[in-house]
Curated annotation (Swiss-Prot):
Chief subcellular location: cytoplasm
InterPro entries associated with the record: RITA1
Motif, Nuclear localization signal: chain positions: 81-97
Compartments where located: Cytoplasm; Nucleus; Cytoplasm, Cytoskeleton, Microtubule organizing center, Centrosome
Region of interest (Interaction with tubulin), ranges: 145-258
Region (Disordered): 28-86, 132-182, 195-258
Source species of the chain: Rattus norvegicus (Rat)
Primary role: Tubulin-binding protein that acts as a negative regulator of Notch signaling pathway. Shuttles between the cytoplasm and the nucleus and mediates the nuclear export of RBPJ/RBPSUH, thereby preventing the interaction between RBPJ/RBPSUH and NICD product of Notch proteins (Notch intracellular domain), leading to down-regulate Notch-mediated transcription. May play a role in neurogenesis.
Protein name: RBPJ-interacting and tubulin-associated protein 1
GO CC terms, sorted: centrosome; cytoplasm; nucleus
Taxon lineage: Eukaryota, Metazoa, Chordata, Craniata, Vertebrata
Source organism superkingdom: Eukaryota
Length: 258
């Protein structure tokens, strides 16, 4: 028994309210009131053995289930202080199962429409679980379309158009270098031809205003000329006395009567 509240009606009288407690009060000592003795019962396998043998050893024993199912009048006389024992095998809820129940055999044909509907929903959920994305991505997220072939970053051989460009550039560079060189040779020849005195030495004070291709003043009398220019200018005068000037055209020999 458990005292809950004390009401003060008079200073000399007290009223105690009490209700059934679900705590094992034997832990606190002997109870104040008399408690009904619980009937003894055997486990279910013992009862099954006795039934199979057909032996009735004595008066039938009252089980807890029968005692719980007694009338409320008998309950009011002797209150039950212990809680009812729950059945651990009782089905609590119907939750959809995601396992393949066809492995356990065929279902009974007495199933209702609701069960068939839930089975269809479960099958739909199972189909979505087995879906896998495609191996190759398609659409705007793909880095390149599938139809375009891959191009090698480092080609194995040199391209065919490079030699043409290189030869063209070499030809242009050679032409560009030969043109000013020939102009400079012609100018140098004309300057040396005009400025050569009778003594055969070139003038040391030659003007250097011909640009970057103008020849430098030479200290020695010999001037270096290309064979092309000498052939063009001095092709007619091959015979004659040798002079130290190779680049300039030699003077005509004087006749003996002069």
């Amino acid at each position: 028994m458990q005292a809950l509240h004390l009401q003060h009606r008079n200073p000399r009288s007290y009223r105690v309210k009490a209700r059934a407690s679900y705590v094992d009060e034997t832990l606190f000592g002997s109870p104040t009131g008399t408690r009904p003795t619980l009937p003894d019962f055997d486990p279910p396998w013992v009862q099954n053995c006795n039934r199979s043998r057909g032996v009735s050893p004595g008066p039938p024993k009252v089980s807890l289930a029968k005692r719980d199912c007694e009338s409320p009048s008998s309950r009011g006389s002797t209150p039950n202080l212990t809680p009812r024992k729950k059945n651990k095998y009782r089905l609590i809820g119907h939750t959809p199962s995601y396992c393949d129940e066809s492995l356990f055999g065929s279902r009974p044909q007495g199933t209702s429409k609701e069960r068939s509907r839930t089975a269809v929903e479960d099958a739909a959920k199972l189909r979505t679980l087995f879906w896998t994305p495609p191996a190759t991505p398609r659409g705007s997220h793909s880095p390149r379309p599938r139809e375009t072939p891959l191009r090698a970053i480092h080609p194995t051989g040199p391209p065919r158009t490079e030699p043409r460009v290189a030869t063209g550039s070499q030809m242009v560079s050679r032409d560009g270098l030969d043109a000013p060189r020939s102009l400079g040779q012609r100018r140098s020849y004309s300057l040396t031809h005009l400025a050569v005195p009778s003594t055969g030495h070139p003038a040391s004070t030659a003007p250097q205003t011909n640009g970057p291709w103008s020849p430098r003043p030479y200290t020695s009398g010999a001037t270096v000329q290309s064979p092309l220019v000498t052939r063009k200018v001095c092709s007619g005068s091959v015979s004659g006395p040798t002079t130290p000037q190779r680049g300039a055209c030699p003077q005509k020999p004087k006749p003996p009567w002069k």
